[in-house]
Every structure is written in structure tokens, then in C-alpha cells.
Amino acid sequence: MTNIRRTERVLLGAVFAMEAGGSVIFALMGNLQDEFQFSDAGLGFIAAAGFMASFVMQILIAPYADRGHAKRLLIIGTTLAVVGNALFASGSSLIIFVLARLISGAASGLFLPPARALMASLDEEGVSERLGAMGGAALAGFVTGPVIGGFLVGPLGLRWPFVIFSIAALISLFIVSTQHLPTLPYSKDRQRLAFGLLKQRSVLVPILMLSSIALPVGMYDALWDRFLTDIGASDIVVGLSLAAYALPFVVLSRFGGRLADRRGKVKVSFISMLFVAPLTALYGWFTVPLIPILLGMIESCAQAAGAPAGQGLLAEGAPEGRASAAQGLAGACNQLLAAVVAILATWGYGQVSAPTLFTIAGACVLLMGSVAQVLARKLPQGRPA
């Protein structure tokens, strides 16, 4: 038990550091643009580079963790996190910043799937609880990175936040590389592309459920700032609203996972979706910023149960020797869906009213989640749910 707890703490700390170091750029992109005078399109190139690299790594490279290379991928991912932030700290051109973001995105894509698979494999009991804790640590890091970066850039200058997070990643690298980690169940079969796992219902169901509750995130990434500003929120209120949305998930995700382990992962993930869908539909109907913010906090509570439930279901449903591949596939699908939704939402916001747009999004959540629930009824008997 002691070794399990120690490994859990190492993985949680490393995930927090990885996500914090990867997200600090979001608070500093405007500063980089002002300092080095590149176009608005350059901001898009930097953001897109991270997404593309993470997506490719999760699909093509993360499955190698299932061949006995899980720790090696964690080490390589953490090393890339050091390099990515070091490049941001030393760079002075758009090309270097795009390369730095490409490396940082690859770091996350290499690290997270094997980390989730290892966390799930530590014990047959409490799978969703541990994955919930990891999700909470990841989101806490993602939110903390920009806050620390924004706080440090004034007194220390633009380069030092990246230097500090590069040092933090270096410390994480030392801890991960010296820690004894378990090995994932080994597969000697020839590995095919992870997309082939979608043919298996035990993988498709949790990915559909996870994608359904993750769908609104793509809208929030693209529209939350603009929507709240349009209904009268100040920049400070918008910033606080993001922290308010994240806080319930960070605090409750471990408990949500524990609930899923006890009450059933399919049941908890479906009930969570039934909360997320109407809450998503309601956002656009209010013109007082406080109400959407409060709805977001309620939705975050539902996400804190649904996400660990879906991830735990995926961990248990992945074929023997394909645990990391399945986790990478789920992460890649969520990223792809979020990108598509962000593009469509940005376009749709200028074409239809906010109530209509958010209602459509809520209906899509309900549709995807309902399809997953129907398919879940046909899962093989005896599979943990």
C-alpha cells in the first residue's frame, strides 16, 4: 500500500507540473506578441502547434507504453517539457515560439496517456477514484500555470516564468526517473493504430460518454470570454469565472471517482451527462453574468463525477495490453472534438442567438450521451461497470 501511495503521489505531482508548465503560455501570449511584434495569426499558429503535437503523440506514440515503455515515455515527455519552456524563455521569433509550443504539446501527449494507464493499474479497486484525483491535479495545474505566469511577468520580466516552469519540470524529471514505477500489462501483438480500438464496444462506450461531457469545453474555450463580456462582465469577472468553474472539479473529482467505483461507472457517467446537457443549454438564456457562472460551478460538480467514471470505465474496458493506447485515443478524440466545436461555435455565435447556440450544444451532449448509454446495455455480461 505504501508503494502504491508513493507512486500515486509522484504521478499526481508530475501531472500537475506538466499541465502548469504547458498552460503558462496562455497568460503570456499577448506579452510575447507585444514584445516580438508578430501578427495575430501567429497566436493561432502557436496554439495550433500544441494541439497538433499532442494529438499525434497520443495516437501514434502513446501506445508504445503498452510494449513495456511506459516509464520511458514519462521521462521523454517530462524532458520535452523542460525543453519547451526553455525555448520559450530563450526565443525571440515566432518560429521558435511555434517550435516551443510544438514540443510542449508533444510532452503532454506523451506523458498523460501512460500516466493515466499506470494510475489505473496500481490496484483493481478504486480505479475511478485515482483517475479522478489525476484529473483534478491536471486541471489544478492547468489553471495555476497562467495565474503564476501572470503574477511573475510583471516583477521578473517575460522570460522568467518560463525559466521557473522549466526548472519545475526538471525537478519532476528527476523524481519520475528515479521512482520505481509498475509496468503495464505487456502486449506482444503487433500494435495497430489506436483508432481500431473504437471497434470494441467496451472502448467506444466510455469514449462516447467522455466526449459528450467534454463537448461544452470546446465552446467555453472559444466563446466564454466573449459571451460573458457581451452580457456585461468585466475582464476580472471573466478571469474569476474560470477559476470558479475549475474549483469544484479540482476539489470533488476524487470523491466523484469514488462514487463511480461504488455506484457503477456507467450509471454515474450517464447521470452526470443528464446534468451537463441541460446546464449547457441554459447558459445562453441569461443576461446577468452571475447566473451562467453559478451554472458553470454546478456543471463542474457533475463533471467531477462523470469524467472519472468514464475514464475508469475505459481503463476496465481496454483490451489486455492496450491500456495506454485506449487512454491516448480518448484524449485525442476529446481534443479533436473540442477543436471542431470551437470552430463551429465561433462561426455560429455570429449567425444565431446565444440561447439557440447553447441549446444546440446541450442537445448534442444529450444525443451523444444517450447513444453511449444505449450501447452500454449491450456490453458483455460480467464486465465491471
What are these regions (language model features)?
Residues 5-51, 205, 214-231, 238:
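Helix-loop boundary and gating motifs at the non-cytosolic
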Residues 322-350:
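A late C-terminal transmembrane helix in Major Facilitator Superfamily
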